Amino acid sequence: MTRRRRSRPLTRDEVIDAALGIVDAAGLEALTMRRLAADLGVEAMSLYYHVPSKDVLLDWTVDRMRTELRLPDDVPGDWADSLEAVFMEYRRVLTAHPNMLPLAARRTGTEGMSGLEFLIEQGLPVEDAVDLYQSLVGFTVGYALLGSAAIEAVWSGLPPALGDRLREWRDDTFRRTLRTLLDGYRHRERGA
């Protein structure tokens, strides 16, 4: 089989976009340098000009997915209201990329540090900031798993009204529980 030739040079952004596309379409295990190269019409070794290693590519792919977060410029209220908006949106993005969930759970990237810095700047003690941030990420990833295709496949076999109610329950419960978690830390911070 003859490999198609590229008419222009490959960019790092194209590599990352193609990697995310492979994971979205076929799962994380389908992302190999050989598959990525074939999809891009290049030799596998040429990818290493743009990407130092597959591990780095995985980090960049998570970062690319997170660029889809649509965050408001200004959220009325305090830090807890801001975090509620951020994690509602993070869940939306994770649910849109269910095959990325294992990576997103393990790779926080620079967002983890900026999230912790934000909480510390708001006056939370370092220990509380770390606990809250880790809890928010774990909770959000867990709920995104409840929105995964596997769960939807199970729910699709239920009577339509029950499946619809379970979806509503999942969404309502996520927001309520997120708010309860944030309110608890807000109360601790005010009481300190």
Task: Tell what function each PLM region has.
Residues 1-13, 20, 34, 186-192:
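Actinobacteria-biased recognition of intrinsically disordered, low-complexity terminal regions
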Residues 51, 61-62:
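DNA major-groove recognition helix of helix-turn-helix
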Residues 71-112, 126, 133-136:
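Hydrophobic alpha-helical connector segments
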Residues 14, 56, 85, 89, ...:
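Amphipathic alpha-helical interaction segments
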Residues 2, 124, 149-192:
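C-terminal peripheral helix-coil segments that are non-catalytic and often amphipathic
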Residues 113-145:
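A contiguous pocket-lining binding segment that forms or flanks enzyme active sites
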Residues 14, 18, 22-56:
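Helix-turn-helix
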Residues 63-68:
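Short, basic, alpha-helical segments at the C-terminal edge of helix-turn-helix-like DNA-binding modules
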